[in-house]
């Protein structure tokens, strides 16, 4: 095989790219070969042997029909998701309330395709999930960033004023928030929904780590305005499987069916996610371990003099640094990869295995005396 790249002389600036994409950078966390990787909020525990065995057999059976297109509407998977949501949140739902796609990013993209677009606006409270503005731009939806308060929580007075001023078609609320880990109460979410002229997407990617009630409990009260998005990439130990979903009134599922690509979710993805849901009790048992480790790590960071936002997730947002990127490099020099999310003076660390957390804390202890 040749290792000569075809047409390398053509650069991005030579292409007739959409003007609003010029100068932008592609999304992506650093993927570096280091001993301790605590930068992408994955569940560090591998799948159970029982899950792997079940997956192998299920994929083997599925492979006999790979010459055929997959089940178009993911009915079996949506049934399994509905059963999970019913038990996890206490809200009775059916497959008609569930939609699944390739990670929550595709779920959010489909919602933006259906409810955003040219001439429409999305609004979010920053810092928050960095893909919200990126997905908005990709769908030609204007994104309006409203700063959070000094404590990184949503300033409700400012939020309601911004909604009145900008009249957004879509509002994003991430709870627990990424990268800060704090939650937005149901009472505040209701205030936002009541003020919203369009739809509200509550991003609950990390909901399993929080004891707070899910926004799905509000769907019957606001069926035409509320969508709750979730993922199997975090607590579910299924980041490599790429499966996201949302819970909403059936009309929202009808809406995204208008924009989804045909057969968007492969037969293998559907089969693997259904297997993961069958073994959810084993997998979600790791949530308690990670929550306990989060408490331990947070306590030690406090002892070392770091500030942090109280977290109900599997990560901690901490500081305060004079130059957070220099501090990020200092952790990397010590073999620990964490995340610089671009927020001045702060970094984010994923909670890993106990020994990984010990390595992080050892590095944090050394760095605390460097005045970075």
Curated annotation (Swiss-Prot):
It is an enzyme of class 2 (transferase). GO terms for molecular function: histidinol-phosphate transaminase activity; pyridoxal phosphate binding. Coiled coil: none annotated. It catalyses: L-histidinol phosphate + 2-oxoglutarate = 3-(imidazol-4-yl)-2-oxopropyl phosphate + L-glutamate. Keywords: Amino-acid biosynthesis, Aminotransferase, Histidine biosynthesis, Pyridoxal phosphate, Transferase. Its EC number is 2.6.1.9. It holds the Pfam family Aminotran_1_2. Disulfide bonds: none annotated. The modification N6-(pyridoxal phosphate)lysine is found at residue 234. Pathway: Amino-acid biosynthesis; L-histidine biosynthesis; L-histidine from 5-phospho-alpha-D-ribose 1-diphosphate: step 7/9. Belongs to the class-II pyridoxal-phosphate-dependent aminotransferase family. Histidinol-phosphate aminotransferase subfamily. PANTHER family: HISTIDINOL-PHOSPHATE AMINOTRANSFERASE, HISTIDINOL-PHOSPHATE AMINOTRANSFERASE-RELATED. HAMAP family: HisC_aminotrans_2. Homodimer. This is Histidinol-phosphate aminotransferase. It comes from Corynebacterium efficiens (strain DSM 44549 / YS-314 / AJ 12310 / JCM 11189 / NBRC 100395).
